[in-house]
Amino acid sequence: INSKELAITHLFAVPAPLQFMMQHPEFNSTDFSRLINVGVGGAPCAEIIIKTWQSKGIDVIQGWGMTETSPAGIFLAAEDSLNKIGSAGKAVLHTEIKIVNKNMKAVELNEIGELLIKGPNVTPGYWNNEKATKESFHEGWLKTGDLAKFDSDGFVFIVDREKDMYITGGENVYPAEVENILYQLDEIAELAIIGIP
């Protein structure tokens, strides 16, 4: 990164290595001036990671996708990285997304539901597995298993995996939200929140 001749200009990573780099003793003294942007995806990214890299003057570009979406489905453009921290962005070209409740009805703005996606980049089904295909699709829409919400500008915020949510005290608790809060503590290097019955 410090080499004038060989310095990288673009970096893509899942959140963990970005966090590990932040914890390196030389992180604060490293010259990141040639690094234009950091792309992050593959797992929920704690806001502290986004804010820390952005404080270095680096655009953090987030995205969401899965193998079934070849792989991109949602993308947050660099110009939105500061004003939409925590968002995965908007649907990629020729792709449609919606967020629905358990009855497959569209949810209101800022209401959490399951993210559905369809488009030419989305698989038509699972090879030789009609059961999995039937369970994973609803009227041509892929049911992702991810919980998300739209803000008033149409940006998608991934909340967590549906199977990771747990209920305590009558409240829905999303591990990623708890992790985002705990990551703000200097004493926390790495953590994972798991609901135990």
Regions found by a protein language model. Name each.
Residues 42, 65, 89, 146, ...:
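Active-site glycine-centered loops adjacent to acidic/histidine catalytic or metal-binding residues
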Residues 17-18, 45, 122:
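Alpha-helix capping/helix-boundary segments
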Residues 74, 90-94, 105-136, 171-173:
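Conserved ATP/PPi-binding loop(s) of AMP-dependent carboxylate-activating enzymes
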Residues 2, 24-25, 129, 169, ...:
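Residue-level signal for well-ordered alpha-helical positions
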Residues 11-14, 103, 119, 124-125, ...:
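AMP-binding/adenylate-forming catalytic core of the ANL superfamily
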Residues 94-96, 139, 144-145, 189:
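Short loop/turn microsegments at loop-to-beta-strand junctions
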Residues 3, 8-13, 22-83, 96:
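Gly/Ser/Thr-rich phosphate-binding loop
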Residues 100-101, 109, 144, 150:
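Hydrophobic alpha-helical segments, especially N-terminal targeting/anchoring helices
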